[in-house]
Amino acid sequence: MNSLKISDNEYALIEHPGFANNKDAFFQTLGGVQSIQKACQTSFQNPKQALLELNLRPKDKYHHPVQARVQSRNDLLVTIKKMDNSVQNVSRIRQVFLFRDMADFQYSTQNSPFVQKLDSTLRVLDYNAINKFSIDLTPVQRKHVDMPPPPVFSQTSLPMSYNFLQNPLVGRVRLPNGKTTIVNLKGQCRVWIITTNMGVESVPTCRHSKLGEPSKTIQEVIEALKPLFEKRPVWTRRALLNHLDPSYTHYLKFALPYLSYLWTSGPFRDTYTRFGYDPRKDSNAAAYQALFFKLKLNGKHKGTKTHVFDGKTLFPTNRVYQVCDIVDPTIAPLLKDTQLRSECHRDTGWYRSGRYYKVRDLMREKLFALIEGEMPSEVAVNMILNAEEVEESDRYSNFDEQDNTDLNDTVRGLNTSATDDRINDLMRNLMKRSQEHEGFEDLEEIDDDYDDIFGD
């Protein structure tokens, strides 16, 4: 086997993106022979300082060149004769100039009178021509602005690697009729939960028709839920989780559709109710009504995942409280010792509106204080407790029908005593805190923790 000695000579390689049919034109695109020699010499001494630019229009002074990137290599340079395929002049290639950047946007100045005047005077470096050069400042309405282009249009030098691929989770399947369609092969398992609202005449009595037979694990969760729904027909998801084994947490959302339906509006919103049980027809269901609060907390608020409200501890993960789970000594008696409605109201349920809104205001005040890390103000609590319980018909009266003079007199009458002044101060502070937190308004949409009421 023949061996060849590698020469001590070292070379730099230039990868030109064009065809070198004309040697002189080839050198001009790289700035000339001197520019090439200087760049190659610098690449061996300090590669980061080596500058070699590719100009595809060498005669255009406003052309934006493409700069080469220098990379270190350990390649071989050989000369091969076609006649006998002999190899000679083996040398090393240490540096390579690569033009991998994208060319910048180009702007032709060929038809620009201002650029032509600028080139014929300033670029020739003639004193007399420069002395005669002037810019016409007369306002003229031009269709196009005549001025030199900027040095750079785009700062993006490397192309984006989009790597376009077909969605791996989507595939084409053949239907029974012979046609093909594109389906999601690995879509999320759908939870066939039946939902209802306060406007329906009757509640669901059985599970969804598309709900298949449960798996072994789901059946275990169902068996654990049955005694809970027999004891209490209406539950929140958080309350059920606290009564089940922690290992069932992930499977709860798949088991609930076999035993219950979900309320999407009204006083039982976001509660799971046993099939066949209609809380609108049973006054005892007042204990299962739910109160909703929107809390906006920062990361420092952490607590246990309980569904019980005692008025002293903040539980950030719970935004929905059922009446039977409220044990606060101030609020609980208000819910027990009150006269219920004869029919279930679509907004306040079995409770009269005056008592319902008083309880809601008390809970809001206590939750505000807990967010601040303080105990609720006794003055604010007593003010809410002593407030008149206004029924809904009076609470939402049409003020447009009232005389403006009478209304102004009523407002002026609020400031007739020191007690009223104190109440006004408290209300202003309460409004200020509401604006700061943006944290407590009755839920018009489900909170972050309840974006997926099925548990995702």
Swiss-Prot record:
InterPro entries: TF_IIIC_su-5_HTH, TF_IIIC_Tfc1/Sfc1, Tfc1/Sfc1_N, TFIIIC_tauA_Sfc1. GO terms for molecular function: RNA polymerase III cis-regulatory region sequence-specific DNA binding; RNA polymerase III general transcription initiation factor activity. Phosphorylated. GO terms for cellular component: cytoplasm; cytosol; nucleus; transcription factor TFIIIC complex. Residues 394-416, 437-456 are annotated as: Disordered. The keyword Zinc does not apply. Pfam families: Tau95, Tau95_N. It comes from the Eukaryota. Residues 441-456 have a biased composition (Acidic residues). It is found in: Nucleus. Signal peptide: none annotated. One of its GO terms (biological process) is transcription initiation at RNA polymerase III promoter. Component of the TFIIIC complex including sfc1, sfc3, sfc4, sfc6 and sfc7. The subunits are organized in two globular domains, tauA and tauB, connected by a proteolysis-sensitive and flexible linker. Interacts with sfc3, sfc4 and sfc6. TFIIIC mediates tRNA and 5S RNA gene activation by binding to intragenic promoter elements. Upstream of the transcription start site, TFIIIC assembles the initiation complex TFIIIB-TFIIIC-tDNA, which is sufficient for RNA polymerase III recruitment and function. Part of the tauA domain of TFIIIC that binds boxA DNA promoter sites of tRNA and similar genes. Participates in the interconnection of tauA with tauB via its contacts with sfc3 and sfc6. Serves as a scaffold critical for tauA-DNA spatial configuration and tauB-DNA stability. This is Transcription factor tau subunit sfc1. It comes from Schizosaccharomyces pombe (strain 972 / ATCC 24843).
